[in-house]
Amino acid sequence: MFKTKSVKNILAILILLSVSVMTSQEKFTLSGTISEAQSGETMIGVNVLIPALQTGVVTNQYGFYSITLPKGTHQVTYTSLGFESYSQTIVLNAAVNNSISLFESTEMLDVVILETDIEKTNIKTPQMSVTTLKANTIKRIPVVLGEADVLKAITLLPGVTNAGEGASGFNVRGGAADQNLVLLDEATLYNSSHLFGFFSVFNPDAIKDLTLYKGGIPARYGGRIASVLDIYQKDGNKRAFGATGGIGLLASRLLLEGPIVKDKGSFLIGGRSSYAHLFIPLVDSGNENIAYFYDLNTKLSYDIDDQNKLFLSGYFGRDTFDLGDVFGNTFGNTTLNLRWNHLFSDTLFSNLSLIYSDYYYGLELKFAEFQFDTGIRNFNFKYDFTSYVSDAVKLQFGLNSIYYKFNPGEVFPTTDNSGRNYRKLTDKYAFENAGYIDGTIKVSEKLNIQAGLRLSNFTRLGQESINVYANDNPIIYNQNLDVYQKATPIDTIAVARDASIKSFLNLEPRVSAAYQVSESSSIKASYNRTAQYIHLISNTSSPTPFDIYAPSGQFIEPQLGDQFAVGYFKGFEKFSLEAEGYYKEVKNRIDYVDDADLIANEAIEQVVLNGQTRAYGLEFLVRKTKGNLQGWIAYTLSKSEQRTPGRTAIESGINNGRWYNTAWDRTHDFSLTAQYKLSEKWFLGANFIFQTGRPATFPQGQYEYQGQVVPVYEARNASRLESFHHLDISATWNLNHKSKKRWSDEIVFSIYNVYNRKNAASVSFRENTDTGNNEAVRLSIFGIIPAITYNFKF
């Protein structure tokens, strides 16, 4: 779809527009870092406005801002959600460094629960399909189970759905969960959920800022084709020791922070653990079951001087699920990140990151007496630059290199009588490299453009043993039986670790534009191409998040996604309206042949085919952002489909080559979120979600063959589970509502699934022993769950 000529055109436009907006008028740069007055924590996304010039800028992920203005006297206003605005007069006869601190606002009436656009500023920005939540915003989201949950918050937005009870992750605009790039302090997390999606892996007390990109993804992000969830942890209090935590019936948490060297260095350490299994049976299985999680967040930060800062952060989390003598399941993420901020000048900011990420997944099948372990590990080097060329032009550029090690599986016998022997599948290795440039340009008072280009390369490295197939075809088609079968390797070869098995190169253009129709409304449009080189091999019908990651290579092509979106944004005095439409195509989405075996499969290429997906939809969001009653209504009408045609004219393909619903297709997705300030001491909250049931494939008949009953299935994903819906309510009792006191605490009363809806996680079929008839059996994970949590902070 994308041609080299188009790349040249985009770069030419970017350069010409950059030159055209610059003038010869004498100008100087105003720059600095914005922090919270109480803690010294740097602030992301603070609006730095110059009203007289109708221009401004926002602070970056490290609280830094830079804007070039004409020589003279300027009134500058600093604003951020939940903080008191600050204005000052600055005489700009030379470059000025103006670092300030903002005080938290004591007035809660006008705190916006959800910040998708700060109207006056972001109506003009070319970015669309973006949602930002800050730390103080997250705290005001209606609380269920005693603590704010960022994943539950984003699944209340249009275009975002949960993966369903009993499943991990979330889905964005008809994409799969593995197509989301989830970052914590720039480190990749491969699983974003705890306890079957009931909790997220993000400790709300440790989070500073969250940004979700559903479309219009900036060029600095790559490697996934559906969305980017970019989360930054707090740095820690540089001025005083403090603690935040909560004690509840289902889980507890504690976070400690304080200065190492006052006003220069700080530490943060926070932990959480659940114990819900002690009180609540998860499934009615007749077996004793255990399900719990724990995680740990850590961070050290140090300001070497005004131009250099160091950060060392980490995360460790584990989930354990044990179902009696049936199976046990353990999985989790580990990350470590060292970052160095350097300010080359008042207009050139840089960040160098060295990142380690690891994901482990273990499954013990007790009835089969063996343990299966798998995982993925990567080492990531990133060097990002931001150049504030002028008040109308900002350039971002950088390099990124990732080294992958894939563990496709390791099998351990768990008893002496196990029929399984120890087996280690061959590890796989790969390099992913990229360079990018992205420019944000104010073309006129009404038109703003963001255009960028990412060049990515993925190289599959050598390994000890590689299968060789006749005609390079690992899957053969049996025309007589109309089935796909595994091809028998004709040989195996060894390739040196530093040699290339297969290499891919992709250009990924990104462009967004905003045209301001009036002071309170704008029209936006965006296009982005993204490439994804790693694939999740997962049985989506499993009640556990069965995860095996595989690299692209000689038999599995990288996924390529193209997305177009248009939107209309309108702000009113107390309300705002956002409407977006999108269309997305993905090439080389893997699809499984019928009866594909995934566990301990040394040759996964023998059970997958390359297909394609498409998704399109309309999204609507109405927000009420002022007054005692605040909240939003979100609705999405969408379609997500997949097709895997035959490779030749005689092959039937998957589902006879016809389009079928993906497992994450939701025709209707409606959510209502509200919070009501009853008094200074009491806050009431409620969430309601309704979604079309998840697609499923059910048998439509059966036959007997050699004494065995064989089910006959209908078209793939032609049926659906029942509609998914539940209502959650909460009441927060603020025990100490006077904001100036150092100690603050509250009690949160909440009920998840008030009317005890038995939402189906899966449906299976069995023979009724009394009647001999087949019957459907629905597995429901969660019913009604009441909870009480005591939260505190000092």
Where are the regions a protein language model picked out?
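Short loop/turn motifs that connect adjacent beta-strands in outer-membrane beta-barrel proteins
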Residues: A163, Y221, G236-F241, V261-G265, ...
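Gram-negative outer-membrane beta-barrel transporters
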Residues: Y583-E585, I604-Q700
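Periplasmic N-terminal accessory/gating domains of Gram-negative outer-membrane beta-barrel systems
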Residues: E84, I118-K120, K124-I217, V228, ...
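Short, acidic, small-residue-rich periplasmic hinge/interaction motif at the N-terminus
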Residues: T33-S39, V46-P51, T79-F83, N93-E147, ...
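Outer membrane beta-barrel strand-and-loop segments of large Gram-negative receptors
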Residues: N378-K382, K424, E432, P551-E557, ...
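Surface-exposed extracellular loop regions of Gram-negative outer-membrane beta-barrel proteins
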Residues: Y360, K405-N417, T459, E464, ...
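C-terminal beta-signal and adjacent terminal beta-strands/loops
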Residues: A531, K587, K681, F690-G707, ...
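Short, acidic Ser/Thr/Gly-rich low-complexity loop/linker segments typical of extracellular
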Residues: L53-F64, K502, N506
